[in-house]
């Protein structure tokens, strides 16, 4: 397929502008950032939900449907005999003009046809359980236009899983109510449910429909609803089957005249004793109040301005001026924005994740935290407590939990032995950003069981102990069900195609299969834990009570010493048993055989262990890190990034599990897993190799990819995706699984702290850049603990690593940590 452009960045407005509705894949955006969320494509496809995309799905969407992107919030405009949509779909009537602007938690879709322009602004106002759809109709012709406007939303019957399965029940449960211009979805609003949804418009309507088949017509499609083509609503009332909400509005516009219509899709929960105002009559008081908040253009415009100000504040916490537009737009806008979306969604709801099978991941959410903690530290704090509450007393944890209930997901269970380490990673990042040590004293339960509470610090301690207590024959970390690579299942031995690799019971007996990835992760987080304990010793010594989280200075020093010994022992085990001669092994399987070794015919080298062991600095002084990084560059790098393993597996290996079940070049079998490319990039900065770090970074940076490969890349060019097809694939460079990926947080963490080198630390901001030799100067504004730091970094000699001097407000400081203090500060750094 030939390359073409479908859009471009608009940095001034913080938008990506799509100019062709027929993108290679639906290019989406997210609305909402608290409780009410919507996914919206460039043609207005998608759906809305409250908190949990599985249990509180409000509108229906058809994944993997034909045609693609099937279902959404649609507006049909009938102008004479012509029926069209502002977003092109679902009618696909050729438009005279089309534009979609995806911004920060809003999308504006504009289309025109035969002298009429329709522009729809979609957003979820702050602190609001509703999606606003502000439609502006404008007559650009020289004649009077009489238009027939039909709105459309299809209700989901709350549980998105059973909505697609249990039709013998579903076709009898749907219930609606119509009051003026508002259509209420009250399915199952009886004894068990206290919530309902509604769809309204701020004008008198001339008709409506609430039954899908009545509106569309039997055997018709969304592209040709019978009520629209005939220009006559049916005023249908749904009793079971498939309830919808469609308002019919007649609009007359003189030449040059425009008119706003405000549609509102909302969600309401009532207290149990206030569910009804009369028998079977739902209490609509909260809905009425919500409708009144957004029933005029002025109110909607004010709410939209408030949303934009919110994003101004968030994105001004860290800004860069480098002279490189592609870098600046990702750092200042899109990378931070994607990090906020992954905070809200984890891996639950995208156009690749159905919102049904996955909730919030223990590992995922801890990693995501480093991408947003500087923006919303209070919410980061709560997220840490929620995550820790799903831990078990032995330090293990549920792999996932549901956002609505915050309870662990029993279907997935636990046993992923990297998970506990990530709690250290996330908590340390929070404390370094905020200086809030009090979180460690918070009492947090195990498995959300009342009465089991211990301090968060105790949770961190048992997380470390979980690794120490689960070592294999080479004194390396046991892998358990899997490590970060969920598809490396060394104890599964699955021949049954009907079972899941992740959830089937391990068949390997005993504790044998070991992970070098977890070993490297343990050394990194173990060092963080040791440093935290030493800092807590200082804090306890200076505390009026002499303790922090119930422990005194000597307790923390003893714990630091204990864990340092464990870290040193793991490092030695890696050097002794995990070094293959030119790179780090990936693992030992159940039988004690090497994985990721030059001895193997396939899968000789893996990216994960090269990343984590070099991030940990294991063997740095002995040259092991340089050798491993050189090997990764030589054997894993290709045009589109670094593949996960090489060579790809061409046959199924039962002793390795799911990784060898994928076709070559896709997903975990030698695909470019963008998530782990930053691990090698950070490893490059640890080794002081700024040029290599920059080269790896820009290969997967969306703004660089967007410039060359919009068609080939397929998915959204303004955010990272999880996977890009590797060099062994049928279509190298094709992206999949966009938006909800740990790549977002890792790219942010990598560029902000390791390339640009602005690192939050306990005592202040640690300045330690690692740059390409072409980078001679850049400026960063960083807001941090009540201070604002204007940091100018100059690199006249093109050094890759090493700070020679730092001045703060004109005064030379000792070392590379800029101390915390309120107010504005000028920081000048020379390399």
Which residues are covered by each model-predicted region?
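Hydrophobic, small-residue-rich alpha-helical packing segments that form membrane-like cores
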Residues: 105-107, 157, 456, 509-524
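Non-catalytic carbohydrate-binding regions of carbohydrate-active enzymes
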Residues: 402, 539, 546-594, 626-785, ...
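Solvent-exposed loop and edge beta-strand segments that line ligand/cofactor-binding
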Residues: 350-365, 408-417, 501-519, 593-616, ...
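Anionic coordination/interaction segments
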Residues: 1-364, 378, 383-386, 429-433, ...
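Aromatic-rich carbohydrate-recognition surfaces in CAZymes
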Residues: 78, 360, 364-365, 369-380, ...
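Active-site acid/base region of carbohydrate-active enzymes
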Residues: 319-333, 378, 382, 387-396, ...
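Conserved hydrophobic/aromatic pocket- or pore-lining residues that grip, position, or stack substrates
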Residues: 334, 368, 613
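Beta-rich accessory regions
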Residues: 127-130, 136-148, 193-194, 202-212, ...
């Amino acid at each position: 397929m030939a390359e073409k452009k479908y859009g471009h960045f608009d940095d001034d407005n913080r938008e990506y502008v799509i100019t062709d509705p027929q993108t290679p894949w639906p290019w989406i955006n997210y609305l909402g950032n608290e409780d009410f969320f919507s996914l919206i494509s460039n043609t207005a496809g998608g759906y809305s939900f409250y908190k949990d995309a599985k249990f509180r799905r409000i509108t229906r969407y058809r994944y993997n449907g034909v045609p693609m992107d099937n279902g959404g919030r649609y507006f049909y405009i009938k102008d004479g005999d012509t029926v069209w949509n502002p977003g092109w779909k679902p009618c696909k009537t050729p438009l005279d003009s089309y534009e979609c602007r995806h911004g920060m938690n809003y999308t504006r879709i504009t289309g025109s046809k035969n002298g009429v322009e329709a522009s729809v602004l979609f957003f979820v106002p702050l602190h609001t359980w509703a999606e606003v759809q502000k439609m502006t109709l404008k007559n650009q012709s020289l004649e009077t236009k009489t238009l027939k406007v039909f709105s459309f939303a299809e209700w989901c019957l709350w549980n998105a899983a059973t909505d697609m399965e249990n039709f013998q029940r579903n076709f009898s449960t749907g219930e609606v109510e119509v009051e003026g211009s508002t259509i209420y979805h009250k399915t199952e609003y009886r004894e068990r449910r206290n919530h309902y949804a509604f769809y309204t418009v701020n004008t008198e309507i001339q008709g409506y429909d609430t039954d899908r088949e009545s509106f569309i017509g039997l055997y018709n499609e969304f592209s040709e609803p019978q009520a629209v083509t005939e220009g006559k609503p049916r005023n249908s009332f749904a009793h079971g089957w498939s309830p919808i909400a469609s308002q019919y509005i007649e609009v007359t516009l003189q030449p040059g005249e425009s008119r706003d219509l405000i549609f509102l899709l909302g969600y309401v929960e009532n207290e149990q004793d206030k569910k009804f105002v009369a028998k079977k009559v739902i209490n609509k008081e909260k809905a009425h109040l919500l409708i009144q908040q957004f029933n005029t253009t002025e109110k909607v415009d004010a709410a939209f301005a408030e949303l934009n100000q919110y994003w101004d504040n968030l994105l001004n916490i860290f800004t860069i001026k480098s002279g490189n537009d592609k870098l600046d737009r990702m750092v200042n806008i899109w990378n931070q924005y994607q990090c906020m979306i992954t905070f809200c969604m984890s891996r639950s709801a995208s156009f690749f994740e159905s919102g049904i099978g996955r909730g919030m991941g223990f590992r995922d959410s801890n990693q995501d935290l480093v991408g947003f903690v500087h923006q919303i530290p209070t919410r980061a704090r709560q997220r840490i407590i929620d995550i820790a509450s799903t831990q078990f007393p032995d330090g293990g944890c549920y792999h996932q939990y549901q956002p609505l209930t915050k309870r662990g997901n029993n279907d997935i269970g636990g046993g992923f032995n990297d998970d506990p380490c990530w709690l250290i990673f996330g908590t340390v990042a929070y404390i370094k950003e905020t200086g809030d040590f009090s979180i460690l004293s918070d009492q947090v339960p195990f498995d959300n069981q009342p009465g089991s509470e211990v301090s968060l610090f105790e949770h961190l301690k048992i997380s470390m102990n979980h690794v120490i207590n689960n070592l294999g024959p080479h004194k390396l970390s046991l892998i358990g069900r899997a490590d970060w690579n969920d598809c490396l299942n060394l104890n599964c031995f699955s021949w049954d195609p009907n079972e899941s690799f992740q959830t089937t019971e391990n068949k390997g007996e005993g504790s044998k299969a070991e992970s070098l990835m977890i070993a490297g992760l343990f050394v990194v987080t173990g060092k963080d834990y040791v440093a935290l304990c030493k800092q807590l010793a200082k804090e306890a010594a200076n505390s009026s009570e002499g303790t922090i989280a119930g422990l005194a200075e000597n307790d923390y020093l003893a714990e630091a010493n204990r864990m340092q010994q464990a870290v040193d022992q793991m490092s030695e085990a890696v050097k002794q048993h995990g070094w293959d001669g030119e790179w780090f092994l990936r693992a030992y399987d159940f039988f004690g055989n090497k994985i990721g070794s030059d001895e193997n015919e396939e899968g000789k080298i893996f990216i994960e262990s090269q990343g984590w062991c070099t991030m940990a600095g294991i063997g740095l002084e002995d040259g092991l890190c340089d050798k491993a990084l050189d090997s990764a560059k030589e054997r894993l790098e290709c045009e589109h990034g670094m593949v996960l393993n090489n060579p790809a597996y061409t046959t199924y290996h039962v002793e390795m599990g799911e990784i060898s079940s994928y076709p070559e070049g896709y997903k975990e079998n030698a695909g470019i897993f963008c998530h782990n490319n930053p691990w090698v990039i950070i490893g490059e900065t640890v080794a002081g190799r700024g040029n290599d770090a920059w080269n790896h970074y820009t290969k997967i940076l969306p703004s660089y990819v967007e410039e060359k490969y919009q068609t080939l890349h397929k998915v959204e060019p303004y955010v990272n995706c999880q996977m890009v097809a590797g060099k062994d694939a049928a279509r190298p460079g094709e992206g999949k699984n966009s938006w909800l990926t740990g790549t977002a947080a890792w790219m942010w963490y990598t560029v902000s702290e390791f390339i640009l080198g602005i690192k939050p630390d306990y005592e202040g901001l640690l300045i330690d850049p690692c740059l390409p030799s072409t980078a001679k100067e850049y400026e960063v504004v960083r807001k941090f603990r009540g201070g604002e730091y204007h940091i100018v970094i100059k690199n006249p000699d093109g050094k890759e690593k090493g700070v020679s001097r730092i001045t703060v407000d004109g005064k030379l400081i000792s070392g590379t940590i800029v101390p915390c203090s309120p107010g504005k500060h000028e920081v000048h750094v020379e390399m």
